[in-house]
């Protein structure tokens, strides 16, 4: 592609917590190397989705090739492979780190090291990356570079004697960063003469060209027109277009080991070109794929229903379009007696779920109701069969199951010392098991807990932030399944079960949850002409009950004094009418009632 030898290519990524200035630093590097002209520059150039700019997070990975003339007069090619900084996307982070030889560890000089950064640093160390620490935002009045540098040394174990002090916003220290990438990050191995192996680290759907795949060539050479094989999916394609990202796409004829680029080959969906898959030549395939490929498995499920049943088709089309770009999104049709037709969707985690919902509402103009998120339970039935259940309505009845297991996570929280008590209480309330506590510096502490995933999917993150005034950060990963005393809690309104309100809870919590939910529904369901009972039940046993009194007309208004039998007759007639109405009447459960389930955990 270029006349730059492999020894002058540097592939690196930026590791940083949300809001520590990663996208701004990338902007400055693009500007200083002349990759993007000043007049075309806009804030957060590499964040494509509007939602990313608003939330200040990177969702889809981006890559940019920069040509840089170093102080030694040599021309270098720097490939920046951007990573998402959020816990839900840690697999994507691990793949983009595998495509690099070095990483910039960017830490906000006023905030210090956060849990998510730490998790990504461990990923980088596993991939044997050269890590260059950078203190960002040193121009802020609250910056404490010495304290934070000491923190990085103690927590991460990096030598910070030559730490770079920078302010991406002001452009301070960016040249130093570019020089240190050239001198400290090792060049890729020169394996141009081996069989082709390239790592996919991202892909997106383009309506004209099909799926566009971003990849890093690990071994060998790839040319335009080559027939390639994707080793995990086993599919073959012919490369129609090959190029580099600078950050805009520039077509080239060939790319060799160490380079980063993109190709289009009329691939239909992103699922066919999964992140982490290995590209090799179909006529001469490599012996084995690159290590580390994993299928993206959804962890959190919820039901999505259109408020207007006419929008069902629109919702289906919108989900199909989003899935073209998001291989981790799963969905299947679902019907609910209370909500009509909709979809059961699977997500990587909570942030992923929120982003998908927000994109559906914003980009496709849909009005949606969501049910409470649930996780995947493993149920062993009396026939010794193990089934996976992501929807409470699929749970076999108690007499047909031996045990229910739920997923557990290992969670690490980093918090200022003053909030340790509040966080421990939060974890205790969520059935957490205390594992470890480490003091990093005088003021910062790490808490390690093992918790059921179901307890953190609703609002754990919000609670963590509100109890620590936004100072704590968390990181979690799955550690497996454990058996627990779990039961299905059914909610019945006027004797009919409302499937969208059913949930799987721990037996010890069932009474409190049932009690709180029936009280909440009593406030939210409007009064009808007949008395409406609301019950929470486990199997056939009712554990909590409320009732909404009937609206009644005063039928005795016309009777002045006079005969008691006349009044009795009128009251009995009214009662008979109410009874008949109750047997055939239906109760409208408003949308707020379904939202109440989501908010319920805040109080419990």
Swiss-Prot record:
Binding site for GTP: 19-24, 136-139
Gene3D superfamilies named in the record: 3.30.70.240, Elongation factor 4, C-terminal domain, Elongation Factor G (Translational Gtpase), domain 3, P-loop containing nucleotide triphosphate hydrolases, Translation factors
Cellular location(s): Cell inner membrane
EC number: 3.6.5.n1
Catalytic activity, as annotated: GTP + H2O = GDP + phosphate + H(+)
Entry annotated with the keyword Cell membrane: yes
Domain tr-type G: 7-189
Family stated for the protein in its record: Belongs to the TRAFAC class translation factor GTPase superfamily. Classic translation factor GTPase family. LepA subfamily.
Record-given protein name: Elongation factor 4
